[in-house]
């Protein structure tokens, strides 16, 4: 029967081929060509004619089929209506597909049909293979409007909305009146989206198919009609339980006899246990416990994880930044000034340990020279810095902040710069205020001493202490005599100390000062030439007991030359080494000088009335940096690099030794009450010592960014102190000392004064308070002195 069907099918196809109209090469289908409106009308006529031909050919084929069936087969075997229906359905499906397709013709043939045969002998049409070229993919199909990513809002004021592929304008579609637009916004049409079509400029609406797809997605319905959710299940296993076995073969004898093969395998395991190749779990645990205490000290076994709770992993290195790129942005590259500053900075103080560089490509980047050193330092950090686990403390942060009064309630204190004293060439290293508070004396690298009137800022006195053409010494320290009736100014420059009496103080003060200095010349001539040591600076009369041994002459008191005498220099003290600091006793007859390079004669005490100089120490441990007298006790404070010693001059004994904990002290100052001391250091610290409390600092203040050069208490009744640093700033503090020994001093930061420029890593070099007012004078490396007032 199947053979007959195939025969009839082949005959029907041959008949159709004979009756089908011939198609010329010029009318073959080509969907790639573009046609105009007239060609489209012709193509529609051709489609209609082709539909009629298809219908006629189908009718003729049905009649011929019925005749063939009647000749070869019976009606009971094959139903001719089935064949006719199938053919009719096929024809209808083809016509339905062709009715909605616009067929375009071209002059050249692009699709040639090749006829062949199936395996059963039927003919087949061999179509050309589709070449997967770029033109066959329309995923990146260009839009009709070629404006790209430009928004349509850019064309709102223009009559067109863009341009097509040929550069012609795409005109904007006509819009309705304002009433129509209002009605459309109220009554939304079906398929309304509120979007604009970029190709046409009109509102974008959804089709019925898209609306139906959205409805199915909202209702969780099946979006593909070809999928049947109710397909019949395939029962791979039957649900019926079989009672009888599929086979009733009796069990063989080998099922009930021990297996020889298993016996061999068991004996093999037994021999392994006897030989020790297989260890039972109990013995294995015992061996592991024994091996736990036996390990190789030099074994590099890093595979075993050590996940103990107290083991802390090494911190990870921070990720590289843009500065470390081989092609960093321009703003990360250093300028010539920044590069020079980076090279002059100490390696420990540099922000980065490399200079950002830019290369054209990665292959041009050379080897990193500091890689080995950085790895070594990383290893040292991990080896020498043990990691410690700290438990977090549940402490209220507000309780850690001291309850300090407001700075507004602690006025007066300096807040602004009122006067700038400018006249020195180079750095201004030191300055001092006379006891009356009217005159300011400054000394600098130019070797001159200048006296300024404080109220007007006018220079009233000038003295060339050092001749820069012959000597390179600088004026390192100067200080007025605390006795306002004499007007003596002591100046330390190089290895000499000059005693000046400025000619601006009036005849009486100038005469009293010169007379006090000249009295010493007579004692030096007719007095004790052996210059016995006398450390009792508070005594009214000399103690000439023979217990003190005669000391060698450590200084020379010289008379000035005529030119120096005309400038106001009354006496010159020649020392062995350069003098860096000097300080007067409160009575004005003694002053102490410090020469750090002079060894055991680093500290010298000079007596003005007798022209005597003596060294109170036979040996000196360490480098002496500063020395001060106690405000009212016969005590001398001597500061070395790391310690501060307090000597009793009347008993000539060491009374106390303070350990500030700093690496290199720069200066000290004593509170007017005498029971507190301030020390400054080059490692950015300010240390407050309570002399009645302990040898260690009561407070250590770290607020400066660079070395602290000097620190001073206010000598009047104001509880103020200030510190000067190389960062160019001056910090003013309020420090109240109470009579009650059980109450700690009150330290409150008040103001940070900035105005001096940092020159060659040097900022503010010295400072001094006004004896009566809350005024502060500072000397900077920028060649100026400044007055800070309230």
Curated annotation (Swiss-Prot):
The disulfide bridges present are none
Q: Where is this region: Required for interaction with YTM1?
A: 371-407
Kindly indicate whether the keyword rRNA processing belongs to this entry: yes
Protein name in UniProt: Ribosome biogenesis protein ERB1
Q: What is the lineage of its organism?
A: Eukaryota, Fungi, Dikarya, Ascomycota, Saccharomycotina
| Subunit record text | Component of the NOP7 complex, composed of ERB1, NOP7 and YTM1. The complex is held together by ERB1, which interacts with NOP7 via its N-terminal domain and with YTM1 via a high-affinity interaction between the seven-bladed beta-propeller domains of the 2 proteins. The NOP7 complex associates with the 66S pre-ribosome.
The species this protein was found in: Meyerozyma guilliermondii (strain ATCC 6260 / CBS 566 / DSM 6381 / JCM 1539 / NBRC 10279 / NRRL Y-324) (Yeast)
Q: Where in the cell is it found?
A: Nucleus, Nucleolus; Nucleus, Nucleoplasm
- Give one Pfam hit by family name: WD40
Q: Name one GO molecular function term.
A: ribonucleoprotein complex binding
Residue spans of biased composition, Acidic residues class: 20-89
> Which BP terms does GO give this entry?
maturation of 5.8S rRNA from tricistronic rRNA transcript (SSU-rRNA, 5.8S rRNA, LSU-rRNA); maturation of LSU-rRNA from tricistronic rRNA transcript (SSU-rRNA, 5.8S rRNA, LSU-rRNA)
- State the function annotated in the UniProt record: Component of the NOP7 complex, which is required for maturation of the 25S and 5.8S ribosomal RNAs and formation of the 60S ribosome.
Span list, region Required for interaction with NOP7: 255-371
User: Which Gene Ontology cellular component terms are annotated?
Assistant: nucleoplasm; PeBoW complex; preribosome, large subunit precursor
Q: Protein biosynthesis among the record's keywords?
A: no
As for family, the record states:
Belongs to the WD repeat BOP1/ERB1 family.
Q: Which keywords does this Swiss-Prot/TrEMBL entry list?
A: Nucleus, Repeat, Ribosome biogenesis, rRNA processing, WD repeat
| SUPFAM superfamilies, A to Z | WD40 repeat-like
